[in-house]
Amino acid sequence: MSQITMRQMIEAGVHFGHQTRFWNPKMAQYIFGARNKIHIVNLEKTLPMFQEAQEAVRRLVANKGTVLFVGTKRQARDIIREEATRAGMPFVDHRWLGGMLTNYKTVKQSIKRLEEKTAALENAAESGFSKKEILEMQRDVEKLERSLGGIKNMKGLPDAIFVIDTGYQKGTLVEAEKLGIPVIAVVDTNNSPDGVKYVIPGNDDSAKAIRLYCRGIADAVLEGKNQALQETVAAAQETAAE
């Protein structure tokens, strides 16, 4: 698992919070002080809390669990998609659709529709559709892919959710709480840590900081998968030896 250091966090600007006038008092315990009216996050707290979150992810994935990566703000989208894909985990990078988890049955129907439309599009020319019809089909598929592409291979509800910016993803937190799904989240000084099981206090606006968080969580996923694979191989060898 990648060992994120204090130096890397400083270089990525993890310690820069929001303007002091926008602060959330619930984050007081994670704030070191203020500089030029900007709150400074206490990295002495962030680093071990991030490591704890990584360890929780590793354990969960080693037990065949699924972590849903969520980050729909502009700075996070590409990074969330890239790192979740690298880790082989589902993600939401475009827009959180209301009921994405609490109404998962309906979402599954939409995913089925996406699969059917994608298959139809692949055979559209042979099936005699006009260029205009094919273009309309492409638009439909692209629209569905943007909203659901990241979760189309998800087999059921996730076992945990990793969130960038709790203020931006309030809908995600509400649904997770309703379903009892634990949340691992980056929480900046202007947001509340309520409803987050594993709080990572830090900058949620800097692309460098977002990359650092996502890479660290994705690495934890990959380590968990590797552990699960090793345990499966060891069990198979044990059975074969009997």
UniProtKB/Swiss-Prot annotation:
InterPro entries: Ribosomal_uS2, Ribosomal_uS2_bac/mit/plastid, Ribosomal_uS2_CS, Ribosomal_uS2_flav_dom_sf. GO terms for biological process: translation. GO terms for molecular function: structural constituent of ribosome. SUPFAM superfamilies: Ribosomal protein S2. Gene3D superfamilies: Glucose-6-phosphate isomerase like protein, domain 1, Helix hairpin bin. CDD domains: RPS2. Keywords: Ribonucleoprotein, Ribosomal protein. The keyword rRNA-binding does not apply. GO terms for cellular component: cytosolic small ribosomal subunit. NCBIfam families: rpsB_bact. Belongs to the universal ribosomal protein uS2 family. HAMAP family: Ribosomal_uS2_B. This is Small ribosomal subunit protein uS2.
